[in-house]
Every structure is written in structure tokens, then in C-alpha cells.
Amino acid sequence: MRYFILLVLACGGVAACGNPLGLHAYSPNQTDTVSLYALSGTPISLPSGFSIAARHTVRTELASAFDFAFDIDTAGRALLLPTGTLKLGKHSGLQISAQPFDSIKIAPTSNYNLDSALVVNDSSVVIAYSNLSVCGASLGVPYPYYAKLHVLTIDTTSTPNGRRIDFEILTDLNCGYRGLEPGVPRR
């Protein structure tokens, strides 16, 4: 009985610290500049999706392992599409932020758009979370990864390098962490 009480107290202490599984951040948050091409009206060989976990663009005709894709609708609006919009399951989410890119320090836990297109413009700031991933140190508990992106340019023309969005994206690939600042996250 004494050991049970000690175990309960230890678990409570770990949970009170804000990281219930005691996972340590190991990977520095990284910012990359990315170009995606519209799902429609561009060669199929160009990447239209982005995987947060891989920190890489994805050719959507080769794989569905991406967290969001880019397209341009018939009205000429630039769209970011979470997986639910593409009937791939509601596994990732996006939300527009009113804060400047550099001011966002931590990802919110709610109010993500899971199943409809997000209209973006030049300078839009978006917060995203990924499909759930099981990390080695998480004891089998799946976690999403978080990211923030800042739209740099959108080209809606049909020129050879058009129908494209360019953005900078900062990704946090640490299980259980939502920190969106450069370096190893603390929260």
C-alpha cells in the first residue's frame, strides 16, 4: 500500500509539471521557406502538399501522408486545405492567426479548422497541427506536431511557375510540446 501511495504522488508530481509523461524536447524548432503548387491547373509532378512531421513538401499523387495542401479556387482565391477537406480524415487542422508570425510563442489547443478550406492572402499567418504521431519516448501515446506559417507570396497566374504559394514555416517536432519559437522549445 505504501508503494501505491508513493506511485500516485509521483504521477501527480509529474502531471503538475505540465508534461504528464515527462517527455524532453530534443529537436530545435526549424524555419524553412517552402513553395507549393495548386492541386488544380499545375503539372502533377509539382508538390501540392506539406508534411509537418517530415518538414517537407509532398507530391499528392504519390502519397497522402501530408497535413495540408494548396489550391486556387475558381474565384482565384488561394486555399489551404486540411486533410478533412480532401476526404482523407480529419487528422490535421489549420487556423488563421491575427498575431504577427514572430509574436506567436505557443500553439493553441483548440479552434482548428478540420474540414473546410482556409482562404489565405499575402501576409496571412496560419497555425497548423499535424496527423498524430507516436514518438519513441511517449510510451505509445500519439501526439500532433505544431507549426506556424507566414504567407510570403501567392501567384495565381497560369504562367509556367504560377499557381504557387511561397511561405515560411516554423515546425516543432517535439512530442507533447506546442512551443513555436526558434530553438528547443520549453513548453
What are these regions (language model features)?
Residues 17-187:
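Surface-exposed, beta-sheet-biased, low-hydrophobicity segments with strongly acidic/polar composition
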Residues 12-16:
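C-terminal motif of bacterial Sec signal peptides marking the signal peptidase cleavage site
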Residues 1-4:
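Positively charged n-region of N-terminal signal peptides that target proteins for export
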